[in-house]
Amino acid sequence: SISTFGAAPSMVGYLYQVRLALLWAIRRSRTSDFVVSLETLDDVSFEVGGEPQAVLQAKHSLKTTANLTDLSAELWKTLRVWLVGLASGEIPLGTARFLITTAAAAPGSACGALGIEGRERDVAEAAKRLKHAATSSINGELKPAFEAYLALEETEREALLAHVYVIPSQPDAAEITEQLQSELYHVSLNHQALSVQMLEGWWFKRVLNELVHPEGGIPRAEIDAQISDIQESLKPDALPIDEDLDALMIAL
């Protein structure tokens, strides 16, 4: 079937990555300055003064029952990226590393032990489970990741995993819209959906331009300025007449 050549999962994954970058940028803009980049050090990276503060791996699954286990390719491919970045010095040890996925973390798994917070977070247990997975698996595709992990001393593994956070069961690429609307509630109480459409319209073009013509990332100030412009344009005394609004909605 010609459908075997389809790239829908990959395309959805890229769109998820772009939307997730915007969502995290809005959230981080409340507490710190940054420059956000896509497809440089990681899927998404936040830097301050040229130093990476946080890197994100975004994993989107079209399967509603996807689970992250100790042998999941998504987990080990992510760890390999971070291990290579650590070895090269491009991603320092102290950088926060986030694996954000629509899949669930299997109970009792290493991913379950690497959650954001709470009693379930247990770095030593995660390190032990990952060592067992790496030494017992016969998956040839993941062998380079296993070898890179096992090349570290036990203390080095735990030091790395202390900066690794797995955030499972996240909204999918379409459902992120609701989270964006919640984050932009202050922009316009009566036009939340429109404010998201306007911001994303700018964001997708801005990301594309940055990927084609790299300029060192997208600074927080630029995102804040765009949100402020949208907020001003959606004030009652600045709203366009109905015909103009309809035309804008069609264009978006």
PLM region spans:
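Acidic metal-coordinating catalytic centers involved in nucleic-acid phosphodiester chemistry
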Residues: 1-8, 59-252
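Catalytic centers of nucleases
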Residues: 10-11, 15-84
